[in-house]
């Protein structure tokens, strides 16, 4: 009987039928037929098992490291640049199969107990095709699947990892004899065994990748089309062959690849040439502009090569997407500008440019910053940049033939989507692309609708603790590389999350680790992340301080009153729904910043006749009686807030000791910025401000004015929500983070605004926390669960929304009045804070790569995300025994209960 082709075997050439071979050529003899029909004799004894369904994990073609040759990269040495190829070999279709033995029911075979125990521990995996039961000779198979045989039971999974059949009751000899070509009836489905899957391929998940996650090149979109040739051309003109020969002779690199320190891109291999060079153009070296190379640092040169290989489809079988996840301050913008300028002028095939038009989508506050960077590195004549704002519409870009780069904000993109869809962009760059972590939002949907295959995501923010967010980013740059979302969850997310559970078995842990490793291998080829350690030697020292401030008397009294409210008590008993705990948390955070913020909220709720939030009104009940009778929030005092009191003294000390240095003052809330602005006015500090109300067209001008050496501003008031991402504020050398956010990435981004390339002064960072309050609890959650240093993805699953157990809420809604620092108490540190404490030894955790989902071969000595154990290695100072050498901190000790300090020096980077 001729075996019908499986769906997976017909992909790409479904109309081609297997060659027919007469049955007589390979018809088994009569003795073989009798042997196969005898149940007491081993089935298919002479047939070898074909194990070529998927390559094993040891196959060097999987995630192989193809470093560029010396010819193609003459300037870059000693770099770790992997170029992986996924070679999946389809099993050879047999032209004539041996007779099939259809098992419709288990057979009665005597089995010893020893054999049964042995069979229970035996697990086998098979690739199969399945269909509904049919008596037709040539069956129509409905899909591919994976058959898992363990002992006397089996599980049938489709290529999305979903169970489509289970069974038990077969004798172990029945299941032990399963071989290629055998037909079985399982759960109302008829299956045919196509081959054996190795345990490595199953545990890594590679056996599921033949389906939706195929990395094959789409020929309809990738293959170069031949240009139209006019059949009525003049016979007097030179032939196309002669023209092509002339073109070949004139094909030379734009820049000399043999000059010292030249940066030459890798040449495409033969497979790439076969797909993308149908016209047989000569290979030409692609050389980065020497002017740009002169200013590039080694890690930036590596990043340009990485991006070039990704968008050219050299790293992954024609896939043209990339994620550049370098930490803040490593020059992602310059790397992209170099790539755009290179691809717009050069190409590996005949020197023809690879791209014509580029779309850059960025947060509104960075639109003008991108334009400024283009002008800085390329001038205003070499490349024409068009930025979209209220005065400059997309229609102007469409009408003009001079502009080649369109820079637009995410908000303006949604408004102008219809016009942008009509433009053919060859390259799409999404700055701060971590906002695309949800594939269902309008922004992501709009960008996906653009017909542009070359896509780059830039993000300095770690992708936060959600594998589905990670999938959304991966699927955006390289659609379908991980299959559908449902298959991704079954094959990768669920096993990985299950392996992290405390109750996970050893088998589940091993499976989760293997799936995580395979996910790392798949995605590491187009994800590049470097930490800030690689530029530490170029930066001045950084002194980071976590300052715990004692709350004021009014704050303590109000805090107690809030914790004793009926709403908080019901929260702790789990009696209320609709997340009232979030209202309580918000009220406590306002109180930590300043009591006047809480006073304003109480007054607003009392005056609001349409307010339906009874819980919030109940929470504020009786709080007004705690305030003085004549309390006026506009006439607030600094002593009412412990943090504001410390801030006021700190600003005065900096202004006195370093009058030429500037301060960046950051808050998450506009109302808090209003208070800080009033403090600046009272003390006569010159300030500028950037928040959500600042027009986008003015933001870059404000930043440039602050960074200018001739600026008279002393303080830059910054909203972390509006301007905490991407801004370069190297004009300031002191950064004060007034409040804390649940998302550690928000704080990290804000703190990275000043310690960047170009900073001339030592950087001082101060994080102000109210001792014993909810702010300290949030800080503990940051460093113990998520860390202060990013990874591309945290494989421990936590909820995207703020959800707490009753025990966690009890911890949050507790005021520790007797402790100078609850965080220090949790460290079990033996120091008393009377002198500098640096721990027994500074532990450095060696990790195999800079990000959890990155190439295994990239070694790094970078520290892991800051944990409670690492915080123990910081310097500890008690407020009662402050022996500080820091000239700023030693003069603000009056209301400080504890200080953690860490110094990153230029020499050691620690």
From Swiss-Prot:
InterPro entries: Helicase_ATP-bd, Helicase_C-like, P-loop_NTPase, SNF2-like_sf, SNF2/RAD54-like_C, SNF2_N, SNF2_RAD54_helicase_repair. Residues 649-810 form the Helicase C-terminal domain. One of its GO terms (molecular function) is RNA helicase activity. Gene3D superfamilies: P-loop containing nucleotide triphosphate hydrolases, SWI2/SNF2 ATPases, N-terminal domain, Tandem AAA-ATPase domain. Changing residue 418 to Y: In a colon cancer sample. The keyword ATP-binding applies. Its EC number is 3.6.4.-. GO terms for biological process: determination of adult lifespan; double-strand break repair via homologous recombination; mitotic recombination; reciprocal meiotic recombination; response to ionizing radiation; response to xenobiotic stimulus. ATP binds at residues 326-333. Pfam families: Helicase_C (PF00271), SNF2-rel_dom (PF00176). It comes from the Eukaryota. It is found in: Nucleus. It is an enzyme of class 3 (hydrolase). This is DNA repair and recombination protein RAD54B. It comes from Homo sapiens (Human).
């Amino acid at each position: 009987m001729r075996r019908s082709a499986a769906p997976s075997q017909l992909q790409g050439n479904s109309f081609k039928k297997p060659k027919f071979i007469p049955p007589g050529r390979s018809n088994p003899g009569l003795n073989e037929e009798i042997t196969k029909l005898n149940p007491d004799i081993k089935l298919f004894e002479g047939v070898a098992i074909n194990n070529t369904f998927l390559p094993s994990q040891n196959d060097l073609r999987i995630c192989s490291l193809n470093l560029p040759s010396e010819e193609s990269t003459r300037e870059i040495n000693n770099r770790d640049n992997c170029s992986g190829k996924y070679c999946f070999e389809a099993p050879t279709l047999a032209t004539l199969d041996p007779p099939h033995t259809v098992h419709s029911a288990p057979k009665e075979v005597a089995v010893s107990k020893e054999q049964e125990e042995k069979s229970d521990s035996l697990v086998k995996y098979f690739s199969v095709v399945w269909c509904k039961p049919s008596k037709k000779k040539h069956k129509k198979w409905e899909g591919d699947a994976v058959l898992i045989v363990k002992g006397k039971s089996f599980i049938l999974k489709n290529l999305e990892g979903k169970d489509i059949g289970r069974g038990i009751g077969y004798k172990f000899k029945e299941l032990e004899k399963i071989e290629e070509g055998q037909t079985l009836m399982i759960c109302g489905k008829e299956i045919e065994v196509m081959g054996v899957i190795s345990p490595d391929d199953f545990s890594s998940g590679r056996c599921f990748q033949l389906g939706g996650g195929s990395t094959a090149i789409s020929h309809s979109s990738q293959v170069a089309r031949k240009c139209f040739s006019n059949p009525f051309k003049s016979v007097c003109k030179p032939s196309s062959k002669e023209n092509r020969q002339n073109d070949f002779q004139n094909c030379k690199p734009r820049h000399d690849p043999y000059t010292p320190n030249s940066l030459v891109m890798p040449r495409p291999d033969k497979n790439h040439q076969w797909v993308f060079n149908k016209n047989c153009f000569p290979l030409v070296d692609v050389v980065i502009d020497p002017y740009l190379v002169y200013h590039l640092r080694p890690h930036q040169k590596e990043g340009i090569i990485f991006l070039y290989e990704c968008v050219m489809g050299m790293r992954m079988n024609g896939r043209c997407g990339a994620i550049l996840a370098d930490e803040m301050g490593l020059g992602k913008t310059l790397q992209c500008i170099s790539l755009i300028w290179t691809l717009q002028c050069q190409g590996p095939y005949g020197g023809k440019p690879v791209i014509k038009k580029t779309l850059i989508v960025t947060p509104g506050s960075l639109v003008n910053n991108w334009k400024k960077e283009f002008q800085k590195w390329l001038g205003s004549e070499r490349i024409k940049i068009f930025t979209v704002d209220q005065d400059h519409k997309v229609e102007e870009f469409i009408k003009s033939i001079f502009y080649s780069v369109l820079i637009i904000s995410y908000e303006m993109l949604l408004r102008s989507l219809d016009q942008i869809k009509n433009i053919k962009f060859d390259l799409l760059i999404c700055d701060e692309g971590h906002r695309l972590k949800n594939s269902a939002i309008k922004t992501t949907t709009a960008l996906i609708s653009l017909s542009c295959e070359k896509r780059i995501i830039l993000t300095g923010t770690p992708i936060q603790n959600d594998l589905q967010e990670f999938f959304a980013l991966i699927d955006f740059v390289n659609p379908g590389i991980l299959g559908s979302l449902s298959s991704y969850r079954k094959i990768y997310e669920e096993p990985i999350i299950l392996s992290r559970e405390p109750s996970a078995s050893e088998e589940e842990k091993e499976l989760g680790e293997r799936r995580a490793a395979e996910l790392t291998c798949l995605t590491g080829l187009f994800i590049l992340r470097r930490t800030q350690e690689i530029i530490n030697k170029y930066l001045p020292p950084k002194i980071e301080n976590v300052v715990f401030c004692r709350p004021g008397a009014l704050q303590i009294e109000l805090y107690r009153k809030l914790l004793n409210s009926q709403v908080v008590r019901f929260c702790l008993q789990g009696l209320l729904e609709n997340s009232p705990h979030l209202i309580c948390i918000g009220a406590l955070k306002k109180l930590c910043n300043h009591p006047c913020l809480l006073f304003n909220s109480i007054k607003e709720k009392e005056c609001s006749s349409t307010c339906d939030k009874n819980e919030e009104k109940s929470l504020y009940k009786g709080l007004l009686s705690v305030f003085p009778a004549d309390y006026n929030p506009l006439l607030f005092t600094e002593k009412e807030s412990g943090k504001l009191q410390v801030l006021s003294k700190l600003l005065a000390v900096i202004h006195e000791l370093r009058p030429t240095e500037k301060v960046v003052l950051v808050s998450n809330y506009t109302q808090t910025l209003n208070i800080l602005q009033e403090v600046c006015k009272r003390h006569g500090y010159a300030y500028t401000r950037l928040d959500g109300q600042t027009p986008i067209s003015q933001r870059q001008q404000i930043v440039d004015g602050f960074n200018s050496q001739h600026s008279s501003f002393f303080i830059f008031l910054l909203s972390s929500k509006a301007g905490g991402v991407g801004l370069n504020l190297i004009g300031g050398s002191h950064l004060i983070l007034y409040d804390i956010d649940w998302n550690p990435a928000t704080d990290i981004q804000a703190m990275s605004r000043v310690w960047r390339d170009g900073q001339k002064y030592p950087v001082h960072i101060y994080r102000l926390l109210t001792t014993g309050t909810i702010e300290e609890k949030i800080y503990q959650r940051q460093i113990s669960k998520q860390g202060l240093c990013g990874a591309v993805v945290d494989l421990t699953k936590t909820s995207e929304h703020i959800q707490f157990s009753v025990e966690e809420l009890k911890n949050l809604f507790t005021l520790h009045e007797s402790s100078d620092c609850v965080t220090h108490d949790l460290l079990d540190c033996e120091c008393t804070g009377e002198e500098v404490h640096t721990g027994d030894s500074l532990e450095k955790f060696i990790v195999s790569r800079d990000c959890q989902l990155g190439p295994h071969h990239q070694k790094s000595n970078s520290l892991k995300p800051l944990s409670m154990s690492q915080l123990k290695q910081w310097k500890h100072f008690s407020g009662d025994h402050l022996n500080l050498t820091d000239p700023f901190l030693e003069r603000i000790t009056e209301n400080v209960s504890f200080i953690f300090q860490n110094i990153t020096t230029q020499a050691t980077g620690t």
